[in-house]
Amino acid sequence: MAKRKYKRDSKIPEYEFYILDDVVHFILKGRAMVDGTYAAVNMDKWLIISKYEWFLGKSGYPVCYELGKIQLHRFVYTLILGTCPSGLYVDHIDRNKLNNTDGNLRLVTPQQNSFNKSTNTNKKGVKKISDNNYMATVVKDGVRRQIKNIPTEIAAAEIYNMMAEELFGEFAAFNKI
């Protein structure tokens, strides 16, 4: 498959956007325009960001191909503090890939980033082990912590949330109950 080359047009892209509390919310280009998917950045970054075309990538992150396929949260971080140190990731605190405001981005280790992962099932750390028994599991530093024989899935999710908060602190991803 041939690589597509993106040629920089001298024309600055036009965006549909609105400003709320010093945050610019703008519709991403491409398929996101049909859905009306908005990304958010601080006003002081907007003048630089708006010079490029930002698309909604397959991973759900806004991405710019003109800059060598960089994701928006990484680009914003470089505008704030410069290059991301080797071995660290730029993480969205609220886990919203479209919220790229300064206060929502932080540097994390790969392990901290893994604590903050979401699941599609809303049963993070919960497994059914028999008809009326569930298990809550948390793994940190290669050590598995489990509580078994929990009567309901909701109770197991609540127990997982408590264990995750204790072990992962601000990096914990919780089940919505």
Map each language-model feature to its residues.
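Conserved recognition-core residues within compact binding domains
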Residues: 1-89, 95-167, 171-177
